[in-house]
Amino acid sequence: MALSMKMRANARVSGRRVAAVAPRVVPFSSASSSVLRSGFALRCLWTSAAWAALASVVEAVKKSVGDLHKADLEGKRVFVRADLNVPLDKATLAITDDTRIRAAVPTLKYLLDNGAKVLLTSHLGRPKGGPEDKYRLTPVVARLSELLGKPVTKVDDCIGPEVEKAVGAMKNGELLLLENCRFYKEEEKNEPEFAKKLAANADLYVNDAFGTAHRAHASTEGVTKFLKPSVAGFLLQKELDYLDGAVSNPKRPFVAIVGGSKVSSKITVIEALMEKCDKIIIGGGMIFTFYKARALKVGSSLVEDDKIELAKKLEEMAKAKGVQLLLPTDVVVADKFDANANTQTVPITAIPDGWMGLDIGPDSVKTFNDALADAKTVVWNGPMGVFEFPQVRQRTVSIANTLAGLTPKGCITIIGGGDSVAAVEQAGVAEKMSHISTGGGASLELLEGKVLPGVAALDEK
């Protein structure tokens, strides 16, 4: 990509992008259009992929909480947006997985150890425009207190006089947990007045909720207009470093593993990864759309008929770019979509009529393991099969074990996506991965090169 840059004197590079779309493509000789960002002018022959890659790199250079020191934090009221959306037992409301709480601890401890008064909020579940007891953050209090080694006080609101009174009574180094911010419909609508109320009792802002960074909500984007500085927490910064680093400057060979049920939900990320990857491994239900595009019989397997031409295009694109696109060579099929269905393993050329594919087979695992053997960077998003069925989740777990073996050999292994994370947890190898992303949708959008509103709104270094 040809690129020329010029900057005004005393101007600094901004991490924000003017628009979420690429400039129009023009011949370089007449490329007079430029994208201005605080005096930073870009002039080039653009492609959508080049634009996405540049946007992703620029966006990631944000001020972090680690750039703030005791003098900046002591006595200050810090509004922290974390992702405490933990799974709860439906009957007891007990936390069944505290991963997201543990992930928030480094940022919170840093702030508390430096004398800040921490106001912490999050969303939990999907409340329907008002308070619901099953979505209160109350279950978080005991576990968070245990992890921090100090008492955690909670109020039953996130704005208003109750919060103001509680904040007024806080001492340095104390934490106040505010209630679920999605109890107000204004949160997801990013209404300025609500954002102003969230910010009313704070002096500065820290966003450590990568899982919602792709949403422009009041607590992730709106509050930054009222609180300065607005910086990234350690978790958010780690996510950006790993995920953006994997795409913008990967150690090679770079392999992406993309699973899931539908081509339509992963098309953008597959296209973006083709610009960077040496190999792409495809798994999950989407493989049957590729098979049908090859004129193979797929039985009753899930197929997106309107995406068959797209599957052909992706295979052609991979060939043109010299990217090795690997599909399973055998599959586990069932006579019905049920956890207790009859199953058998067959080559992809021999799927019986009336049977549907639910997982990849053992030969496929061997093929994929061979492709991964020399990898130096691996990004994995999405399961290899129907992970919720215990009898057909073993291949996904096998891939998790393979990646765990690569990490000690110097390979950077990055896991993003709910079922991929569940697989490494179930295999007991989570600690052996380089990075496990806390945001499924956010990690996908970052890999696609999209601007994350919650990140773009933060202060640049």
Curated annotation (Swiss-Prot):
It catalyses: (2R)-3-phosphoglycerate + ATP = (2R)-3-phospho-glyceroyl phosphate + ADP. CDP binds at residues 260, 284, 382, 387. One of its GO terms (cellular component) is chloroplast. ADP binds at residues 260, 284, 387. Its main location: plastid. GO terms for molecular function: ATP binding; metal ion binding; phosphoglycerate kinase activity. One of its GO terms (biological process) is reductive pentose-phosphate cycle. AMP binds at residues 262, 266, 285, 357, 388. Mg(2+) binds at residue 419. Monomer. This is Phosphoglycerate kinase, chloroplastic. It comes from Chlamydomonas reinhardtii.
